[in-house]
Amino acid sequence: MSSNLPAAFANNFLGQSSTWYKTTILAFLVINPVVYAIDPFIAGWVLILEFIFTLAMALKCYPLQPGGLLAIEAVILGMTSPESVFHETEANFEVILLLIFMVAGIYFMKDLLLYVFTKILLGIRSKIVLSLLFSLVAAVLSAFLDALTVTAVLIAVAVGFYAVYHQFASGGGLSSNQYDHTDDSKVDSSNREDLEGFRSFLRSLIMHGAVGTALGGVCTLVGEPQNLLIAQQADWNFVEFFLQVAPVSMPTLIGGLVTCIAVEKLGIFGYGAQLPDKVRTILMDFDKQETSKRTNRDIAALVVQALAGVVLMVSLALHLAEVGLIGLLVIILLTSFNGITEEHRIGHAFEEALPFTALLVVFFAVVAVIHDQHLFEPITHMLLHMDESVQGPMFFIANGLLSMISDNVFVATVYITEVKNALVAGDISREHFDLLAVAINTGTNLPSVATPNGQAAFLFLLTSALAPLIRLSYGRMVLMALPYTIVLSVIGYIAVYQLAAG
């Protein structure tokens, strides 16, 4: 027994992950103290690359454990402190509240969402029109709500669609209650090709929607967390923010929608998959079955969900309270008026978001390392000492590149603070400050679609229950985002350059 104990420890470490992956993480943990002893600055950048690696391998092992071990070691080594981690977490408390309560609130609206989107999916046969609709609706919603909430809606809808067909493909019919849609072992061989086609179809729709959240999120004061931060420093109201950013956000919105049409038309970068006929038939049968067995109580529940949806949108658009608190309001309204009062039924709503919330706090620990080790400082100083005529476009590029690897809220905070200090000191004019604020806002919002760690909504999608179901890996997300990354970055750069040129 004693001889097998070390093997048991080794097997338990990171669970079912591959041996090579476990070895790699252990190697990281051994190497980091050595690199830190040589040069803390280099060690900080090594930690960022290691954390990105854990995100890239999210389908092999959830990043919370390996990323968490790396973050704990960073604190122990002194690369950052518990106080700094807490400060970064506290600064993003609104995002944490949003994840805990808003995602759970969306869970209790899934019946209505599935009903509405089933009608849309079955009513529109053109994949290009459907893709454009997903992207445009996500953009409009994100301009007035927030990207994480919209992404949570997209995830809930896609999981609902997937579960319906997967259950049928596994021989479970359309009415079996005891069913696990994560298990492919029972899928009939005759249905596997259609299942793969359906996965590809859902992947493309979800990615169009996810990029749509970035297209709309950049436009308004409430679209992304960093937008509000920038608006506060620039003293812009809702309308002024929209008008200041519009010379960049509107061309990129058009470019994004054209890209959506182009990739679907050409069938490149993983796009172009059509909804298999058999899947369409099953979804139509499901819709008919649900309609036929819908009772007055079910209809009442849908009405309550619709009314709660109106309350949600109005509250968010008018910013009546923090997003997370509005999510809690939705939970209370839906569970109260739809009779969901058992603790175990309520608890399921929180299963999706809490692991990601924990991962996000680990991410904030990495951000704390970036802050305490001043990893971005050389780039910041270089930009502020450039000629004013090129500062705008260069700020756009720098913010875009850094937001691809770090938290875009953190990047925006660093740069808008430095620029505001320069304005207060009289080093730059108010007009130039406005230009740089636009460059920072668009730089952190647009090119950051390149990687899942660039935007919280993308990271949430990558680590959600949906990603493994539709085989949406880190690499595949990067590939599918690539045409959007290129188009948004180029158009955004040109627009900022034109704005700077006057």
Swiss-Prot record:
Gene Ontology, cellular component aspect: plasma membrane
Question: In its keyword annotation, does this UniProt entry include Repeat?
Answer: no
**Gene Ontology molecular function:** sodium:proton antiporter activity
Pfam families for this protein: NhaB
What does it catalyze?
A: 2 Na(+)(in) + 3 H(+)(out) = 2 Na(+)(out) + 3 H(+)(in)
Q: Where are the transmembrane segments?
A: 27-49, 66-86, 95-115, 128-148, 149-169, 241-261, 299-318, 350-370, 394-414, 450-470, 477-497
Coiled-coil positions: none
**Which keywords describe this protein according to UniProt?**
Antiport, Cell inner membrane, Cell membrane, Ion transport, Membrane, Sodium, Sodium transport, Transmembrane, Transmembrane helix, Transport
Q: Where in the cell is it found?
A: Cell inner membrane
How does this chain sit within the bilayer? Multi-pass membrane protein
HAMAP family xrefs = NhaB
The family classification in the record reads: Belongs to the NhaB Na(+)/H(+) (TC 2.A.34) antiporter family.
NCBIfam families for the chain: PRK09547.1
Q: What does this protein do?
A: Na(+)/H(+) antiporter that extrudes sodium in exchange for external protons.
Write down what this protein is called.
Answer: Na(+)/H(+) antiporter NhaB
Species in which this protein is naturally found: Teredinibacter turnerae (strain ATCC 39867 / T7901)
The gene that this protein is the product of is nhaB
